């Protein structure tokens, strides 16, 4: 879980940035990305991650980063609270998909963008 170098491709100056990832473990990459976006002139940086493992000093990295907000699902219970972390329940999606499977309906529409 070590970050080498990070480069920005594109323009973020004057924009609100949303970083998307499937999971966050130690928080180093996400914190570094948020800091880079702000250095390049972003107005704000938020992140959305499906699974919040948040091991080691991840909470401190998030708190000390320039992330305005981190939105995660409740697929993994949080170990602590943070004013920067907002949890969204994935239970309604799971319940709807289970019902669709039970009724032999297609679930592909729930997962395709």
State what each model feature region is.
Residues 1-113:
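PRPP-associated nucleotide enzymes
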